[in-house]
Amino acid sequence: GLNAIVRVDPRTDRVRRFPLPEGRRFANLNTATLDRRGMLWFTGQSGVIGRLDPQSGQMQVWDAPRGRGPYGIATAPDGTVYFASLAASYVGRIDIDTGGVTVLEPPTARQGARRVWPDSRGRIWVSEWNAGRLGMYDPAGGRWREWRLPGDNPMPYAVYVDDRDTVWLSD
C-alpha cells in the first residue's frame, strides 16, 4: 500500500498524500477520525496510533500501549478520542495534547474490541469480535456494561450509534 494518509478534495480534484514518517512504514493503517481541532487521528494494526495536522502536514506516530491491534477509532461529543485494540483486547482513550493513552479494560478478557462509536451522552459502544458481545463504557462513572449477542457464534464487526442513540451492529 501507500503507507500514507490520503486526502481527496472533490471541489478541486486535488489528491494529497501524507506519508508515514520514516521508521513507521508498514503500520497497517486502519481507521481515522477528526478531533474538534481538526486533527486527523488514525490507527495502525501493527501497533501504532497517529495524528496528522492536515494544514501543516505534520504527522506524529506513537506506539500503542500493548503493541499490535489498534483498529477502530472515533471522537466522542466532548472531543475525546477513543480507539479499540482488536489484538490486545482493550479500549484506549487518547490524550489529544500528548498522544498518551489510558487503557480501559472491558469486563470480558480477550474480547477482541474491534470498533468503537460514541452516543450523544458520550458513552462509548464497542463491538467485541471474539466474545460475541456488545460493550458500553460510560466515562462519567468509569463503568462498563456488556450484552451477549444472539445466535451460536456471533462476531460483531462494526458498531454504529444513530442520532436517536439506537445502537446498530454488523456481524
Short names for language-model regions:
Residues N3-R7, G47-R51, S89-R93, G132-M136:
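A short loop-to-beta-strand structural motif that recurs across blades of beta-propeller domains
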Residues D9-D13, D53-G57, D95-G99, D138-G142:
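Short loop/turn segments that connect beta-strands within beta-propeller blades
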Residues R14-P21, Q58-D63, G100-P106, R143-L149:
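A short beta-strand motif characteristic of beta-propeller blades
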Residues G1-A4, R25-R36, F42-V48:
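A generic tandem-repeat structural signature
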Residues G23-R37, R66-D78, T108-R121, D152-R164, ...:
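Beta-rich, blade/repeat-based domains predominating
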Residues E22-G23, V48, S89, T108-A109, ...:
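A short acidic/small-residue loop/turn micro-motif
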Residues G1-L2, L40-S46, V81-A87, I124-N130, ...:
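Conserved beta-strand positions in repeat-built beta-propeller and related beta-rich domains
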